[in-house]
Amino acid sequence: MEIDDCNRGGPREMEQDMTTAQYFLPLATYPDSSSGLIISNAVAFAGHYGAHLHACALTVAIPHIPNAWSSLLLDTPKMIEHAETLSRDRAATLVSAATNLAASAEVELSCRTVKTTLPLLHDTAATEARFFDLAILECIADVPDTRIVAEAVIFGSGRPAIIFPNKTLVGLIDHLVVAWDGSRAAARAVNDAKPFIHKAKRVSVLSLTGEKPLPETSGAHLAEILVSSGINASATVARFTSSSIGQSIQQTALELGADMLVMGGFGHSRLRDFVLGGATDGVLENPMLPVLMSH
């Protein structure tokens, strides 16, 4: 793995201290490229919370494994060279876009390029994310690789991640909805979301009934604890009615006026394929609003 570091801060020099959050933004370059939307959303999000954004462009190295038949039919070395050049060019474009947006928004930005082999691309994203407080990700339905990267980071980094939908998000994140079922993963998500919960103007603790048995007062108890911490929190119970628990949670959160959803991520790796819980799968299949997910 090769690393190229480049620091590109905005015009504002911020004195770094222990309270400055560090956000990680992986930028894919091959076979698909990260979108410009995730860069603009990441810059806006980091700016809102006064965080230092670290963009990491992942370029690929494709090993050439000689094969007699393929050598006769294809110019494999030339194809590899083209793919690697495309990856490098996309990395330069993404880094330039991040630099310009961060400078305009006066957000502190560090950029680096990490070169890795194509099969290890997703694992590399997860490994890089371990150094930071939070990962910022995108999931686009017709770009499967974005979901693969998201799954790798969520379940392999040990860090919380925020998944953004593929649309421009404008405005402050003032109303947080916590999807609460009393589970370990949900508790972990609430703890990881504390910086956002404490800054929010309002927090709604949402429990959906009808999908699995839930303690009747669990959500209300969490809301009480949050209130005792000085947070404007309340509990809400809704009925699960749609075919997808993940979509039902998101739709209910939007109906409540949520700017961001907080939830636990359920899943485990089986032979390098992730077996996901229903809510997690539904959110990654079609994120409808920013979702902080923690595993």
Task: Write out the residue ranges for each language-model feature.
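Structural beta-alpha unit
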Residues: 2-18, 60-61, 96-135, 229-261, ...
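Short beta->alpha connector loops
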Residues: 115-119, 141-143, 183-184
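A short acidic, glycine-rich active-site loop
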Residues: 77-93
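Acidic/glycine-enriched edge-of-secondary-structure segments
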Residues: 109-111, 145, 149-152, 174-180
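Small/aliphatic-rich secondary-structure junction motif
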Residues: 4-80, 156-159, 168, 172-238, ...
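Gly/Ser-rich helix-loop-strand patches that form or flank binding pockets
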Residues: 2-12, 39, 44, 48, ...
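Amphipathic coiled-coil/heptad-repeat helices and related helical stalk/stem segments
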Residues: 35-38, 121, 146, 186-189, ...
